[in-house]
Amino acid sequence: MSNDDTYKAFASRPHLVIVGAGATIDSIPNGDKNGQQSAVMKGFIDKLGFTGILADSGIQFDSDNLEDIYSTLAERNDCTYVREKLETEIFNYFSSLEIPDTITKYDLLILSLTRKDCIATFNWDGLLVDAYRRMLKITDNLPQMLFLHGNVKVGYCTKCGNYGYHTYCCPRCHTPFAQSKLLFPIRHKNYNNNTFIKTQWDIFEDFLSNAAIVTIYGYSAPKTDVEAIEKLKSAFIRITQDRYFDQIQIIERPGFNRNDISSAWEDLSTYIHGHLEIKESFFDTYLAEFPRRSVEGYTKRNIAGWWGSSNKTFEKEKGTNYTLKELAMHISPLLTSDPFDSLSLKTL
C-alpha cells in the first residue's frame, strides 16, 4: 500500500464520541428550556429532589451516589415498591427535559460529525435526540446515534430491530416502536439481558474498534461499572494492527487534574502510544477545529505533515451564539465540499 493509500485509508475511519452525564450538564449550563437541571450520579437524588422517595425505604444510605443507592434497593425484596417508584420518577423527570430554543453544544457536536461517525451516549435524557432532530433541518448527513443505557426518547421495533424516535413506527413493518427501557445503575450490569441494549453495544464495539479518534465527553468510566470497562477494553484492542496514530481526547472541566483520569482511559492510551489529551472545552477539540472533517484534518496534519489551519471552525469566542439560520450558513460550505478541498482545510 502506498503512502497516499495509507493516508486515505486512515482518513476514512470514523470518529467516535462517548457521552456521559457531564456532557448534558455542560450543554445546558442554565438548565433546559424550562430551567430544569440534569445531574451526575453523585448527588443525583438530592439535586433532583427525590429524597422523599428514599425516606419510604427506612434505610440510612451511606452514599449519595445513585448507583450505590439503587443497587441497595435492587438487592432487597422489601424495597421493590420504593425502587419501582424511583424508576418511574427518574423516567418521568428525564422525559420532561426539553432542549432550549437556543443552540447548544449538543447541536454543534452533532453537526461536527457525519454519517461515517458515531455518538454513543450513556445518558437517559433525550436532549441529544432533540438536538439531532433540530440539526436535521440543516442536513441529514449526521452521525449514527447509540444509546448504551436506553433513552427516554428512543424506541425500537421488537420484530425488525430498527430504532428511532420513540413515537415513530418501524420503517420496515410499520409497527409502533416499543419504548426502550432504561438500564438502571446496579453494581453488576448485564448488557446482554435486553435485546435493544445488546444490539446498541454490539454496534458501539464495532465503532470503538475502528475509530481513528475517540472523544470522551463527560463520561468518567466509573470503576464500579466493571462490565462496561471490560467491553471498552476488549473492543478497543479487537483490531490487532498497530494503532500508533490513533487519538483519544477527553473533555473535562477546567482545572481538571490529569492524575484523576479514569484508569480505563489510561489503559486504552497504552495501545495508542500515549496519544491521549485532556481538553477543557468542546471548542478545544478536533470536533470544533475541523467540524465534519475531524479525522481528515487530524490525518492531514499528523500523518501528511500539513502545517495549515481549518477554514471553518466552531470558535470558543463565538460559543453557541448562533441562530439556526446563522449556524446553517456557517457550516454550509462543508455540506457539499470534498473533505480535503480548500473550503475546509486551507494551507498557510
Language model regions located:
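Gly/serine-rich nucleotide phosphate-binding loop at the start of the catalytic core
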Residues: M1-D117, F122-L128, F340-L348
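A Trp-anchored, charged/polar loop motif used as the substrate-binding/catalytic surface
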Residues: M1-D4, I99-K105, H188-D206
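SIR2/sirtuin-family catalytic core signature
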Residues: M1-V19, I25-S27, I203-L348
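Short, solvent-exposed loop/turn segments at secondary-structure junctions
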Residues: G22-I25, N30-D32, W124-L127, N151-V154, ...
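Conserved beta-strand scaffold positions in the cores of enzyme catalytic domains, especially
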Residues: I119, M145-F147, E280
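Short active-site loop/helix that positions an aromatic residue
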Residues: G126-L136
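A short alpha->loop->secondary-structure connector
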Residues: M135-L146
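Cys/His-rich short segments
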Residues: F147-T195
